[in-house]
Amino acid sequence: MKTFLLYAVTAVAEIVGCYLPWRWLKEGGSIWLLVPGALSLALFAWLLTLHGTAAGRVYAAYGGVYVAVAIAWLWCVDKVRPTLWDAAGVVFTLAGMAIIAFQPRV
């Protein structure tokens, strides 16, 4: 559970770090959105270092959680209800994440 939570917090940091510049560019938001956006991306990079395995494995497993958090963002922030296809994609990516993240260590 701790691993999944760390991946989820990492995903939120990345999404916020990308969303704020997007708002500035796409929706004419304040240029000051770039400051918390940059800080959030720096936090994202630091959080990735807290995962205790090889970087490639971390990125692969993190990707599954990122998809789940992005779909939650779609629903909660963008106010777009996910489709059944979105939900199926989340299930499959989380299954892949679990296989990678929780494999036996030898």
From Swiss-Prot:
Subcellular location per UniProt equals: Cell inner membrane
Q: Which HAMAP family match?
A: UPF0060 (MF_00010)
Which keywords, in A-to-Z order, does the entry hold? Cell inner membrane, Cell membrane, Membrane, Transmembrane, Transmembrane helix
Q: What is the lineage of its organism?
A: Bacteria, Pseudomonadati, Pseudomonadota, Betaproteobacteria, Burkholderiales
What's the protein here called? UPF0060 membrane protein Bxeno_B1021
- InterPro entries, per database record: UPF0060
SUPFAM superfamilies xrefs: Multidrug resistance efflux transporter EmrE (SSF103481)
Q: Give the species this sequence originates from.
A: Paraburkholderia xenovorans (strain LB400)
Family assignment from sequence similarity: Belongs to the UPF0060 family.
Top-level taxon in the UniProt lineage: Bacteria
Transmembrane stretches, start-end? 2-22, 30-50, 58-78, 82-102
